[in-house]
């Protein structure tokens, strides 16, 4: 199995900014798998949304805008230390449902469910084995109350 770690942030970014250019460019470069191998396509897991897989794909401005939108939608972030004085976002701690909830074009989330279902449809349609995270079956939102007490 080849885990498609780049898929979650690229797919979410495409919906948030109504621009699939990064997702399209990345997907066209995916090599065909050899016999006995397959991609594992997922957009949610217990680990949050990995940001590191966007390195070399997103430019600085795109990454900055992406992280800002995720923060507005309720994300907390985990960081990795680059050196003594510098850290970078490692992952966004937000459910996919909440990540897709609000965009600059849909400020009240009128089409959040449509984005959520469409994101899963795209993930399922890609070459490979689709993996749907259990919590995604229910459109789970962030649990802020539990986050605060842990």
What are these regions (language model features)?
Residues 1-150:
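Active-site and adjacent substrate-binding regions of carbohydrate-active enzymes
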């Amino acid at each position: 199995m080849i885990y498609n770690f780049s898929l979650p942030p690229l797919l979410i970014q495409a919906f948030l900014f109504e621009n699939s250019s990064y997702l399209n460019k990345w997907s066209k470069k995916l090599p065909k798998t050899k016999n006995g191998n397959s991609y594992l396509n997922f957009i949610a897991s217990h680990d949050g949304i990995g940001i590191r897989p966007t390195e070399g794909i997103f430019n600085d401005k795109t990454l900055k805008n992406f992280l800002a939108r995720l923060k507005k939608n309720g994300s907390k972030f985990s960081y990795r230390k680059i050196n003594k004085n510098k850290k970078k976002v490692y992952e966004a701690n937000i459910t996919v449902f909440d990540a897709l909830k609000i965009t600059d074009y849909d400020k009240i989330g009128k089409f959040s469910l449509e984005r959520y279902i469409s994101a899963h449809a795209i993930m399922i349609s890609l070459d490979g084995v689709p993996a749907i995270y259990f919590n995604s079956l229910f459109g789970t939102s962030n649990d802020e109350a539990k986050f605060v007490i842990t």
